[in-house]
């Protein structure tokens, strides 16, 4: 060692050396002991110290053995039993706190840094170390007590007789044994009573922890219900088959903070009360049960932050409903979420400080220093009314949550069920919810299918993979499993929407006469029963962007309500309904802005033309039954049933090719119009009905078909066929395709053996001329019959 002091020199096995080794620092010079010191340590001084230590150890062992057998030191034994009970309470409380996961991750890391023994003590599963000792283990006598009992019994057995002279022997022995027995019974009773008290406090700790966790989960569910209601009111839904019924269709125009107002108030009151009482308990622990400066650092606690800085009405003990309404922006969802986050942090902070206070290390430092330091007394002094307050808040919030979640949404009163208008609003709500759910499930399904298609393209483009691997098969199976719930949910929503529409259609038909209902049925489109196309070829162009739109048409007027129902409402009610409809329009406009821009009619028509390519039109899907065999409903044209039946019978027979062209009156007019090359190539049947109506004004005109061939479809067909003139067969086939609303099922039909040879144009012209003549004669006969019937 050098004569001068060197700061970088550290003696080996010194406290500073051990400290630097624990910190992981090794960049210092180690100075070993000198040879003289080592020599002195190996001489007689060292041997003398060894002998002295051995003598002291033997003497101490003998003294400890005598103390253990001596009744004078029984107080220490009693204290050990009490310490065993207290230690069991500490460990069981720590295990309850750690197992119920009431601590956030930051507090767990802080406990691991400040007192790692808490985590190991809380995970103890041994009954002797992790639980309270049983009554049998407390009342079990030790060796000294058993020896006293054996000595007393031996003295009694040694006596020859129970005489007065022998009373000098057994009398004091009996008195001493009775006193010993009474003291032992009192000690056992005291230990059993203490164990019962500790068990009660252990149950209280467990109940407080469970109530805190249950309250946190219930507040989270309530906030989710509030958020779901707000989301649904704006036109969205969660990943469920049906949207929640907490926001009916009639409430769509309300403000966001007006939904579930009672539940919002209950959440604010209960969370605020629990936050304040947990904060007071934590401050009480910091003030009356201080630990070291590292644990009680103010930067680790939320409770030291002034309540005025937190806001939300937490600084005042009592807050009125109006003040709370103003401080939380009408109990808005962001304010409730901030308050919930404060509660989570404060609750975790309280249990963290309690765990540090009940740690076994603190028990070893201040073991039985005073009766107030016992852990169950500390717990009782700290919590005070906290368990009762938390239980009351949990019950209040649970009652409010169950009311809004179950009673209001599923158990409606009989008056609401019998009210006519509310029933209609409920049906509209169900239909609206089903359509919204269907739209969003289809959107989610489209996204998943796009992802699956990308994965398949990646697998097909990989040249190294000659066969599909096991990982790829599992990946595809997982993707299909993700898609399946959306498909099932879409089917459920579609079926429910159809059922709702069917019920709404059948209800007015039962109340009104047949003529009026048949006129109203003109607005409903004819749904074709033909199966859809299974595949779309790869070369068919598809739109680059497919926007799924789900919205209500803007042309919503007061005519959507029946005139018979107007007298049921007061002027105030009608004004309120008008405001609600205007608010609904505004919300729908916002929803359309969120979902995407509404495509114009021209863009939609362009997408339809691109979607159905030339290959899809020319190569139809061949069903098992002929496409032409469909019958339109009889209630579509109720004015003249005879004419309508004749019209449809002739029209369908012409499609099926079962009758000759001369039996159809409208085909002649159609062929005459088709011969004009300067006119449009295809004339709809609605234009052909005008000359016939001009012949006889008394005769009711033929009603206009509901499906009219648009100009875009004419251009599409003209571009497909690429011919200068369209004959009667192609025109009639186009009419059939327009009425069926499906271009992929277009089948070419023949209407007689004379048209089989398409190459001979002259034969076709002659046949068409004969057909026109036959049609004119048939039309004249028909008009004469109708005049005779009218007379």
UniProtKB/Swiss-Prot annotation:
Biased amino acid composition, Basic and acidic residues: 773-783
Residue runs in coiled coils: 435-464
UniProt entry tagged with the keyword Transmembrane helix: yes
Region of interest: Disordered: 752-791
UniProt feature, compositional bias: Acidic residues: 752-769
Membrane topology reported for the UniProt record: Multi-pass membrane protein
Location(s) in or outside the cell: Cell membrane; Cell junction, Adherens junction; Nucleus
Pfam families: Vezatin
One Gene Ontology term of the molecular function aspect: myosin binding
The entry's keywords: Cell junction, Cell membrane, Coiled coil, Membrane, Nucleus, Transmembrane, Transmembrane helix
Lineage: superkingdom: Eukaryota
GO cellular component terms attached to this protein's record: adherens junction; nucleus; plasma membrane; stereocilia ankle link complex
Task performed by this protein: Plays a pivotal role in the establishment of adherens junctions and their maintenance in adult life.
Subunit (UniProt): Interacts with myosin VIIa and the cadherin-catenins complex.
Protein name in the entry: Vezatin
Gene designation: vezt
